[in-house]
Amino acid sequence: MKGISLSNLNFNALAAQIIATNSFFRPGDKMLAIMPMFHGFGLGIGIHTALIGGACCILVPKFNVNTYAELLIKKQPNIIPGVPTLFEALLRAEKLENADLSCLKGVFSGGDSMSIELKKKVDDFLKAHNASVQVRQGYGLTECVTASCLTPKDYNRVGSIGVPFPDTYYKIVKPGTTQELDANLEGEICVSGPSVMLEYVDNPEETHSTLRRHEDGRIWLHTGDLGKMDEDGFVYFSQRIKRMIITSGYNVYPGQLEN
């Protein structure tokens, strides 16, 4: 396990980026925060971003689908962040069968890749329960607190995890190098911006191999994730490099098999 050193700037930059790109995120909103506080997603978004934005954090100490469903109905939150398994559970929640979810202004999925099929099911579920929003996917890792890109509101591209936050830059490089690849070519996702970590604690070798200065002079976080970026800047996540399977000369990813 690697300890990650994050600064006040890292957390504050994340909060500013999320609030700036989500006009609905305003004082008085309520966020139903299910993600654990020891997780970058839970601390960085469920607590810090919510409080910076003047929102009320409704904390759920331990996930239980029935309790969560009851809170959705009773508290009428405006924002719910979660992971794909949470949304899978909500689809099966009997307590939500006739629930009115028109209170929702933002539904976000992160922490793991959401399949195209599951996203469609969740979107249909939200629409059937009077919500005017779709689930928006994001991508990030603890090395940049949590999310660093997000699907724009009402502008989804199938399979995409969104576009980078303001002041955050993405590039796709040939794995093991700093060579930037052209649009739509698959390689390692690299991130640069104000939310990128300071270092791995007491691990200078790992820090040096992960945070690299490229020819453009910027420090880039090499994520270890495979993906691509199209001509419009939309990012597509494939898989962790270490999970890639090579068979008959082809690169195969578990996520592709699931979809």
Describe each PLM feature range.
Residues 1-16, 151:
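Conserved AMP-binding A3 loop
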Residues 12-30, 38-79, 93:
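Conserved AMP-binding/adenylation subdomain of ANL enzymes
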Residues 66-69, 73, 88, 96-98, ...:
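Short hydrophobic/charged patches on amphipathic alpha-helices used for structural packing
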Residues 77-82, 91-158, 169:
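Gly/Ser/Thr-rich phosphate-binding loop
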Residues 80, 193, 198-199, 209, ...:
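AMP-binding/adenylate-forming catalytic core of the ANL superfamily
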Residues 111, 140, 162, 225, ...:
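Active-site glycine-centered loops adjacent to acidic/histidine catalytic or metal-binding residues
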Residues 157, 171-190, 213, 229-232:
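Conserved beta-loop-beta connector loops within the AMP-binding
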Residues 159-165, 210-211, 217-218:
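Short Gly/Pro-enriched turn/cap motifs at secondary-structure boundaries
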